[in-house]
């Protein structure tokens, strides 16, 4: 399974939709959580989701801010410019505290560090999403025709 992760506003959903348009199977993590009954209120139970995906032998690409915590073969971390991220999160109604928390997560490499606990560095990729076409091209090069 290929996992696309990153803080909110980095382009995970947009990339996932573009991959689907190209014939890949990319699913939003929250949709899988609903399908597998792994929601606890508004929160995704990552352990439940991981277990259900393993038992279902899920093959595909998953996009979510927590995707790197799932049973991934490859993790792609999307990153973006802080000013663009701040504006996107403001547009989505995030509180100033939540925006700062998310930006701090990108600055401190939290997702990369958590990914390293699960995978070797040569299976973790960072993509700077400044230009959507370049980011998509980089991702296609990484996944090399694999669909999970």
UniProtKB/Swiss-Prot annotation:
Origin: domain of life: Archaea
GO molecular function: adenylate kinase activity; ATP binding; ATP hydrolysis activity
Keywords tagged on the record: ATP-binding, Kinase, Nucleotide-binding, Ribosome biogenesis, rRNA processing, Transferase
UniProt cross-references to Gene3D superfamilies, sorted A to Z: P-loop containing nucleotide triphosphate hydrolases
Documented EC number(s): 2.7.4.3
Annotated positions binding ATP: 9, 11-14, 92
Region of interest called NMP, as start-end residue ranges on this chain: 28-44
Pfam families xrefs: AAA_18
Catalytically driven reaction(s): AMP + ATP = 2 ADP; ATP + H2O = ADP + phosphate + H(+)
GO biological process annotation, one example: rRNA processing
Oligomer and partners: Interacts with uS11. Not a structural component of 40S pre-ribosomes, but transiently interacts with them by binding to uS11.
Protein known as: Putative adenylate kinase
Organism: Thermoplasma acidophilum (strain ATCC 25905 / DSM 1728 / JCM 9062 / NBRC 15155 / AMRC-C165)
